[in-house]
Amino acid sequence: MPESKYRQQTIRAPRGTVLTAKSWLTEAPLRMLMNNLDPDVAENPHELVVYGGIGRAARNWECYDAIVDALTRLEADETLLIQSGKPVGVFKTHDNAPRVLIANSNLVPHWATWEHFNELDAKGLAMYGQMTAGSWIYIGSQGIVQGTYETFVEAGRQHYNGTLAGRWVLTAGLGGMGGAQPLAATLAGACSLTIECQQSRIDFRLRTRYVDEQAATLDDALARITRYTREGKAVSVALCANAADILPELVNRGVRPDLVTDQTSAHDPLHGYLPSGWRWEEYQKNAQSDPHGTMQAAKRSMAAHVRAMLAFSQMGVPTFDYGNNIRQMAKEMGVENAFDFPGFVPAYIRPLFCRGIGPFRWVALSGDPQDIYKTDAKVKEIVAEDKHLHHWLDMARERIHFQGLPARICWVGLEWRQKLGLAFNEMVRCGEVSAPIVIGRDHLDSGSVASPNRETEAMRDGSDAVSDWPLLNALLNTASGATWVSLHHGGGVGMGFSQHAGMVIVCDGTDEAAARIRRVLHNDPATGVMRHADAGYDLAVECAVEQGLNLPMVAATQGKG
């Protein structure tokens, strides 16, 4: 690995109200960049890796230093441009423009392959930004806990009469994203068995209470699951092993889970999925010396993994892809029916997207957990009738360990995001919280992503691969005055399979911030309602009408009806 991608340095975001930069609008991206590399947050901070295989916050350490320096000196009417983790320019704009514009991992479609990206990465010309790694709004595994929880709850509604009590989930992967699964299953009332090939990841999840127990062997794991499901207890169990070995063995034994999914880093066969029979150190070494052979070995193991998932599905076990592109990898290795089980979005989440409901998150720049608890109470006050959301917030406070700066996520839609943002801004203005709040989201949202094997799989009108929508989302958030806006390629499912956009806005208590919040936190989720209404989803059309969206072609269609 080039020396510039490794540095033995501990990064933590500043806390409190003393500014390092010239304003909160530049202090916020500075702190969030640093927070992404906090050792309590990032998977491999010394190599700038935040999560998701090689999802980085900056291209190399020289670029990181230059970004920090640029943000520290950035004026209130300037915008910093980031190209794949490298600061390439500072331009005069205006005080309502974004302070940072980010483009990560974007390639011309014909060249949008892992092979070409890896060549560029080796030359120091590109960086994989994943979704929230390179856009500086990762908050640790909490960032995906509620989405996973909502998925499991909906699966319980659809398949098990509304409850997962006495049921168990079989899955794999305890990295930055997959680490949310055991806690989400527990919160949804289910037991879970999660296979993870790296002991260090299991140790981290045990320490942060995302996993309850570790089993010594497969027999031990199954005995624990049998006991806990019989007793109606929701306990999460981890097993250090390779999913490509364990799932076929479970099929051979005739073991029948109640739900099956997967969140290994299968999207990145060179760095994220350990081939069967290999040690992790061997995998890393071979990735450097024989990348093609390593990728093929990983994909062969993925094929075995998916064949086992297909076998569970054929038994009648609800089985779904959780968005890591493992079905595609298996299909490329000859598993022609790899897509016989669905992805999680068309199976469970799309009705939420139709109403602009998605992963709304916020972070207390003060570093004070009390600021988050106060905002939790404000959410309950404003969204007073949503008891499901209140239950989530109560469970989150009890069970979720803050990683880095205190943060919260809750899935809310078009109707509420603007109201919550304005309320948080008012809390900052009147001193109810001790420092500004930043509001952002995952790129996995209703209007900000095109990903035919994940968020836009099986769209009603066949527009799965149309990527105009995330581009429009990024452009609109820029025009609306988000504090920083990002446009990425390849997040979640790997090179060539997705394009997606993100935004973050600062609540600093000023009237100017309130005006920006009104625009951004309405327009951003509204693009999701627009996208789904355009695709012909009645629920989205109804939401658009209720919220007064001006969608010319949808209005014309409604008029004809």
From Swiss-Prot:
It is an enzyme of class 4 (lyase). Pfam families: Urocanase (PF01175), Urocanase_C (PF17392), Urocanase_N (PF17391). One of its GO terms (molecular function) is urocanate hydratase activity. Its cofactor is NAD(+). GO terms for biological process: L-histidine catabolic process to glutamate and formamide; L-histidine catabolic process to glutamate and formate. Its EC number is 4.2.1.49. HAMAP family: HutU. This is Urocanate hydratase. The gene is hutU.
